[in-house]
Each structure stands twice: as C-alpha cells, then as structure tokens.
Amino acid sequence: MDTENIADASDIRVKDASGDSDEKGNGTTTEEETVEQKEKRLAELLAAGRRALKVNDIDKASDSLSEATELSSEIYGENHENTFDSLYYYGMATLELAKEESQLLKGPGEKESGDEEQAGNSDDKTDEENGETEKEDGEESGEEEDDDDDTMKLSWEILETARCIAAAKIEALEAEQSGISAIEEWNLKLADVLVLLGEHGISDGKYTQAFEDLDRALNIQRNVLPPSSRKIAQTYILIGNACASDANYDETVQYFGKTKDVLIARQTELKHELERGVDDKEKKSEFENELKELEEMMPGVEEMIADAVHSAAQVEETKKAIKAQFEGFTQVLAKLPQEAGDQKEANDISSLVRRPAKRAVDAPTDNQAVKKEKEEEGTTSI
C-alpha cells in the first residue's frame, strides 16, 4: 500500500481529533486520542503481549494482543499491512491458548472419571444421583470441547488473515519492483505465519495441511536465510512432528536428521567466530551462551531421532507380522479338504470371466430335429 496515503490519512485524523470534542449531557467535554497517542498505546500493548508470551503468561498475552489487534485496525483499517504484527502475535497467543485448553480438557476428564468411581462406591449416593452427575459432567465436557474448538478456530482465522496480508504485500512489492530487501523481509514474515499455521494444523489433527504450510515456509526460509539458521532447524522439527503424528516415521527420521545437521552447522559457525576472536564483549557472551544452549539441545534432538527410528522399525515389524499372518491364513485354507470339483474350480480362474450361456445338449430345437430326420432319410435312400 502507498505510504504517502497512510500519512495523509493520519494527518486528517489528527485534525479531526484536535478540532472536535464530544459534548456530554453534563456540559463537560472529552478529547479523543490523537493518532500518535493511539500508536504509542499500540506499541505498548504489543510490547506487553510479547513479554507475556516470552514468560508463557498466555492469558495476559492474549488480552494485551487482542486489544492491540483491535486498536491497530481502528488506526489503519482492517487488513492494512501495519496490522500484521498485532495479528501475528495475537494468533500465536490464541494458538497457545487453544493448546492449553486442549490439555486441560484431557486432565480434568481423567480426574472426574476417578472421582465418579469413588462416588459410585459410596453408600450415600443413589443410582439416580450418580446418573445425574454423569449427565452434568458430560454436558460440561461438551461445553469445554466447544470452547476449545472455538479458540482453535479463532486462532486459525487470525493467522490466515495475517497470511493474506503478507501475501498481498509481497505481490504489491513485486509489482512495484521494490528493493529485494523489502521483499525478503515480507517473505520471512509470510514464512513465520506459515510456520504457525503448520503448528495449528498439527494441533488440530490436519497433518496434510500442516505439512503443506510448513513446506512452503521451509522453501522461503532456505531461499532467504543462511543454511545454519535455527529458524530452518525449527521448521524441520515441526515437519518431522507432522510426519510422526501421521505415522510417517521414515520421513520423520529424515527431517529430525536435517534438524541435527543445521544445528551442527550453527555450532561450527559459532566456534569459528569465537576462535577468530570477538572484540565486542556483549557479542562474545551471546555467542558463548548460544553455543552452550546448542550443546545442551543436541542430546534431545538425538533422542528424538532414536525414537523415530524405533517407531519406524516397529511399523515395519507390524507390517511383516500382518503379511506373515495373511500368508499363514492362506496356507491353512489351501490345506482344507475339498471335493475334486471344488479343487478344480478353485484353481481355475476362468470361471470368473462371464461368458454367454450355452444351450443344453439334450434339448435340441425343432429345427435341429427336422434337420436330423432329413439326414436319416437321405442315408436310408442311399
């Protein structure tokens, strides 16, 4: 979108806000926020939401980012490029909230089941009361599932809106033949949204869609980011998770292995930087901390690979067992006593092909009888 047009619209809002005031019934007036004030409040809400996400305070993050999303739409209009950040982080918070609700739904359900069992053993509970309790618990569980579905759906809608904004911006930049840096920046934003949509698909059980979104994100990242980027490693892990969730363990092993390769490349890169010497103490500390973090992370990745290899082997063993069982069943059937006609029919698949029915030999037609009589008369005359 045109930046100059945005600035012009902002100037109009500032004039309207400073020149007009709403009169209340008591005779007092209240001044509206200027665009600058709203933008400052928006930045504060975004910062607060991101801080809450970092410390895993999802409820607080969701509240701040929900308000930020609403405010950004009020300032710039819906689907404006400047609303992207609010939508992206709000979608992230809502997705985490949906995951939490899904976990909570499983936990209390198990607890209630145990409580009901204890209640069923107590003498002071009648069968009627137990039946009512089970009905109420079932209704509550259904309501919780609906809430979980609503949150999951909301997170998808928010992230999909952000994806559309990024895609439209990239298309506009390419049409304008803008600088490559701006196009790459928005491509990476698109990749970030696609990664979250991939996570959403995994959480929602839509593994094929998750794989497609993550694969698109990976292609963008590999074109823009260095091969040692940890963002690429993260996407590899998520694709591996999508494959594992869909029981494609051979592919899971491959993607987890690629994750390890990227992390090793990053380790090598950091070691070279430190060996060459880093004058900036803060930068050196960052490199050392990241290197330590990667070293601590590596055993977990190797364990994931080992688990995937084990799962792939189990699937292969199961396939072999099913095949052997089927072959054994076929052999048992072959050894069963059969009539001679049945044996011939079983070995002759030609009976499966439909043919026109033949007339019975012992039932000649009238024409055949007449013809036969004439032949006999001819023979007699000879």
Curated annotation (Swiss-Prot):
InterPro entries xref list: NASP-like, Tetratricopeptide_SHNi-TPR_dom, TPR-like_helical_dom_sf, TPR_rpt
The yes or no answer to whether the keyword Nucleus is present is: yes
PROSITE patterns in UniProt: TPR
Q: What GO cellular-component annotations does this UniProt entry give?
A: nucleoplasm
Decide whether keyword Coiled coil is in the record: yes
From start to end residue, where is composition biased (Basic and acidic residues)? 10-25, 103-112, 369-382
Main site of residence?
nucleus
Positions of region (Disordered) = 1-39, 103-151, 337-382
Q: Where are the TPR repeats?
A: 42-75, 191-224, 233-266
Cell compartments where the protein resides: Nucleus
List the PANTHER family: NUCLEAR AUTOANTIGENIC SPERM PROTEIN, NUCLEAR AUTOANTIGENIC SPERM PROTEIN NASP -RELATED
Coiled-coil stretches, from where to where? 264-304
- GO BP term, example: defense response to Gram-positive bacterium
Biased composition range(s): Acidic residues: 125-150
From which source organism is this entry? Caenorhabditis elegans
Q: Which UniProt keywords apply?
A: Coiled coil, Immunity, Innate immunity, Nucleus, Repeat, TPR repeat
Top-level taxonomy: Eukaryota, Metazoa, Ecdysozoa, Nematoda, Chromadorea
MF (Gene Ontology): histone binding; histone deacetylase binding
Q: Which Pfam families match?
A: SHNi-TPR
What quaternary arrangement does the UniProt entry report?
Answer: May interact with zinc finger protein tra-4 and histone deacetylase hda-1.
Instruction: State its role.
Output: Promotes normal hermaphrodite (XX) development, in concert with zinc finger protein tra-4 and histone deacetylase hda-1, perhaps as components of a complex. May act redundantly with nasp-2. Involved in innate immune response to B.thuringiensis strain DB27 and S.aureus bacteria. May play a role in the uptake or spreading of dsRNA.
Q: What happens when the gene is disrupted?
A: RNAi-mediated knockdown by injection leads to strong resistance to B.thuringiensis-mediated killing.
Name the record gives this protein: Protein NASP homolog 1
Belongs to which family? Belongs to the NASP family.
